[in-house]
């Protein structure tokens, strides 16, 4: 607010022609050198700027890598559950340089899930499932299904 008032008053004084603007030009001249404003020499300021740019690039690279890892996870889940692919995720992975893998923790979880699914899909897994099921329940289900089929056949065919 004070800056706004100062600039309005100094503009009015300049317009009157009293020459009040010459002091302001000297103040602005000192502020045009950012190194002096920061209290550093020119070399220190340039080094500081380089360091800031490098840090920003590192942060951007890490951010892009994280985004690509998340996109890779989404792609993996889409493949696993047979969902449609997303071009946005593919683009994020390509932007990261196609050198993106799942984080190690997630990779371990995925590998464990795959092993469990393979065990369930194998013949031994099916046999274990049969052992875990109650034989009486299986027998009742089979008899109910047979009775239902027999009744349906009797309704459709008068010979039976």
UniProtKB/Swiss-Prot annotation:
Organism superkingdom: Eukaryota
Keyword tags: Cell membrane, Exocytosis, Lipoprotein, Membrane, Methylation, Neurotransmitter transport, Prenylation, Sensory transduction, Synapse, Transport, Vision
Entry annotated with the keyword RNA-binding: no
Propiece span(s): 158-160
Biased composition (Basic and acidic residues): 41-51
Main location: other
GO cellular component: plasma membrane; SNARE complex; terminal bouton
Subcellular location: Synapse; Cell membrane
Lipid-modified residues, S-farnesyl cysteine kind: 157
PTM: Farnesylation mediates presynaptic targeting and is important for function in neurotransmitter release.
Spans annotated as Disordered: 14-51
Parts forming coiled coils: none
Membrane topology per record: Lipid-anchor
Alphabetical GO biological process terms: modulation of chemical synaptic transmission; regulation of neurotransmitter secretion; regulation of synaptic vesicle fusion to presynaptic active zone membrane; synaptic vesicle exocytosis; visual perception
Keyword Lipoprotein applies: yes
Modified residues (Cysteine methyl ester): 157
One Pfam family cited in the UniProt record for this chain: Synaphin
Annotated GO MF terms: SNARE binding; syntaxin binding
Subunit structure: Weakly binds to the SNARE core complex containing SNAP25, VAMP2 and STX1A.
Protein purpose: Complexin that regulates SNARE protein complex-mediated synaptic vesicle fusion. Required for the maintenance of synaptic ultrastructure in the adult retina. Positively regulates synaptic transmission through synaptic vesicle availability and exocytosis of neurotransmitters at photoreceptor ribbon synapses in the retina. Suppresses tonic photoreceptor activity and baseline 'noise' by suppression of Ca(2+) vesicle tonic release and the facilitation of evoked synchronous and asynchronous Ca(2+) vesicle release.
Family: Belongs to the complexin/synaphin family.
Protein name: Complexin-4
Organism this protein belongs to: Homo sapiens
């Amino acid at each position: 607010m004070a800056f706004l008032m100062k600039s309005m008053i100094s503009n009015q004084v300049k317009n009157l022609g009293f020459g009040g603007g010459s002091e302001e030009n000297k103040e602005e001249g000192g502020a045009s050198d950012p190194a002096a404003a920061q209290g550093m020499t020119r070399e220190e300021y340039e080094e500081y700027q380089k360091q800031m740019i490098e840090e920003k690039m590192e942060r951007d690279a890490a951010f892009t890598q994280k985004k690509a890892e998340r996109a890779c996870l989404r792609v993996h889940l889409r493949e696993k559950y047979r969902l449609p692919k997303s071009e946005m995720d593919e683009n994020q992975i390509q932007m990261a340089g196609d050198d993106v893998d799942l984080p190690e923790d997630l990779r371990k979880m995925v590998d464990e899930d795959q092993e469990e699914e393979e065990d369930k899909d194998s013949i031994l897994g099916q046999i274990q499932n049969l052992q875990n099921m109650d034989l009486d329940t299986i027998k009742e289900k089979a008899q109910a299904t047979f009775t239902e089929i027999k009744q349906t056949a009797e309704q459709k065919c008068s010979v039976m």
